[in-house]
């Protein structure tokens, strides 16, 4: 966007484009539409869907984007009553969401578990391949004039007395007038280079995949187990972000998201655990997640897992995005947080 507005942009990437969280996630998009009074979340979710439409439909990038909609499983009567009220409230505020019976859900997702009390359906949610999408954004930026430098691990950032910054990597030095920190889970160490404390914690997410299969799952899939638990206690404190699946090493809830990729792989994940910069997968957690997924899509219980992986997500301590100007530094901006 900056390059399209004729700004001179240099992007420094520690590894390769899409090599970490931007390329390791499930690839789910969007919320429940714009609503009657769009807020920041609306722009970040529904706005993202519009950007993907533009990139794929208008600009011709193959991002495997489609507006598939999301089905979120409701597992018991207490959850059903809670989300029945929630759906009414959201619809009154102009959001696109429906409460479906299991029979209605199976009419649009035949493999869904027909024994559950119901499902929430959000037609304005979509999906895309995260690696293809991130690389497409990088290519579009270069076509608009941005310069992308990969394998540039930043080791220091120095404010200049005349304004601007010097950024030192392991191999090069760069200077700029304005600096944007879009460093995800690495906000803490990068912030320390500038003498500022950024309240973002690395949270490990992990996923698993089956072999490629003919099309069996049409929507992105979720579950209300976690959101219902977080509605009662989000688990946050002064050092712990809200809405995690573990606290102090113990599981507090189960979280779920997944879809079937264009290549036929079925991928699911959900765990959110504060473990520092730990990329190792936990086989026990993977199995808990697979069992959770099979409660929603039963045939998954019969499929072997062929690969697993993990990535780090940037969770802010208050659960809100951190976007905008950093007030204690001139010409310093940040885009981070979940």
Where on the chain are the PLM-derived regions?
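Helical element adjacent to the flavin cofactor pocket in flavoenzyme catalytic cores
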Residues: 120-178
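Short beta-strand to alpha-helix junction loop
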Residues: 43-46, 72-82, 121-140, 149, ...
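Hydrophobic anchor at the start of a short beta-strand
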Residues: 7-9, 97, 179
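C-terminal lid/capping helical subdomain adjacent to the catalytic/cofactor pocket in oxidative enzymes
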Residues: 4-7, 99, 146, 161, ...
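Active-site substrate-recognition segment that forms the wall
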Residues: 1, 29, 33, 62-65, ...
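Short loop/edge segments at beta-strand edges and connector loops
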Residues: 13, 101-102, 150-152, 169, ...
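Glycine-rich FAD pyrophosphate-binding loop
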Residues: 3-25
